[in-house]
């Protein structure tokens, strides 16, 4: 929809870990529901169904008020868990193995909040999480260069 009250992020609007804000459509939503679905910095969105089930996105910034589509799951975490650390976990084999084991295999594979809540996530102290994130961010450009060869 080209006009409406508020932008609604869909999984198809997320490419290369960025929201393509120009493609995000507007939607109409009642005032009482906006706060429930409003995106905030450090939220993590998960695709709950289809070919992208399990794909995740860390919301680093929300340049304008936006909500998330119903086929996404939004999660928020305590201050004892780095959202960047959790995002890297969601790119790990351990995450994908657990997700596949908890995904309902139908014509359209899907998972739900319970699948995510039941996952075992290694959670070191916050300072260690930050060191892990810094190290991964340091070596990622090198890994990307090597995989392009």
Each predicted region: which residue ranges?
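Short Ser/Thr-interspersed hydrophobic loop/turn segments at strand-loop and sheet-helix junctions
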Residues: 7-17, 38-55, 69-73, 77, ...
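Short amphipathic beta-strand starts and helix->beta connectors
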Residues: 58-59, 101-105
């Amino acid at each position: 929809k080209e006009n409406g009250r508020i932008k609604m992020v869909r999984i198809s609007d997320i490419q290369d870990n960025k929201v393509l804000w120009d493609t995000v459509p507007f939607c109409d939503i009642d005032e009482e529901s906006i706060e429930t679905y409003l995106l905030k910095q450090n939220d993590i969105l998960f695709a709950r169904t289809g070919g992208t089930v399990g794909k995740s996105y860390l919301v680093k910034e929300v340049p304008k008020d936006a909500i998330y589509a119903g086929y996404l799951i939004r999660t928020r975490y305590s201050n004892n868990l780095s959202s960047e650390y959790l995002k890297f976990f969601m790119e790990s084999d351990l995450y994908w193995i657990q997700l596949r084991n908890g995904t309902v295999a139908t014509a359209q594979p899907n998972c739900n909040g319970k699948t995510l809540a039941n996952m075992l996530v290694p959670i070191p102290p916050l300072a260690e999480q930050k060191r892990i994130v810094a190290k991964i961010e340091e070596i990622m450009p090198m890994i990307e260069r090597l995989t392009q060869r």
